[in-house]
UniProtKB/Swiss-Prot annotation:
<protein>
    <recommendedName>
        <fullName>Protein reprimo B</fullName>
    </recommendedName>
</protein>
<keyword id="KW-0812">Transmembrane</keyword>
<keyword id="KW-0963">Cytoplasm</keyword>
<comment type="similarity">
    <text>Belongs to the reprimo family.</text>
</comment>
<keyword id="KW-1133">Transmembrane helix</keyword>
<dbReference type="InterPro" id="IPR043383">
    <property type="entry name" value="Reprimo_fam"/>
</dbReference>
<feature type="transmembrane region" description="Helical">
    <location>
        <begin position="50"/>
        <end position="70"/>
    </location>
</feature>
<comment type="function">
    <text>May be involved in the regulation of p53-dependent G2 arrest of the cell cycle.</text>
</comment>
<keyword id="KW-0472">Membrane</keyword>
<dbReference type="GO" id="GO:0005737">
    <property type="term" value="C:cytoplasm"/>
</dbReference>
<dbReference type="GO" id="GO:0016020">
    <property type="term" value="C:membrane"/>
</dbReference>
Amino acid sequence: MNSTGFNDTDSALFSNTSFLSCCNVSSVVTDSGFVSAALDERSVFIMRTVQIAVMCVLALTVVFGIFFLGCNLLIKSEGMINFLVTDRRPSKDVEAVIVGSY
């Protein structure tokens, strides 16, 4: 077994860690770090507000759709009932009784 192969891979591993240690993520963050957090909170708040507004509009659309659909079905059912009911005219005897009771 050749020990130089192991030494080469070990040195390659350590060279990568030394490369990563020089370039840490803290250089990407802005000066105070709070500015990016405030902007992130603001964008999250705006996104949540927009989501709530969209859900309210969709809920109102569904509620009014069900309401108007129900009203339309009620009107149609009343029309069908009136169509099925035969037209009954009161007889003259009923009028005489009503007039006579006063």
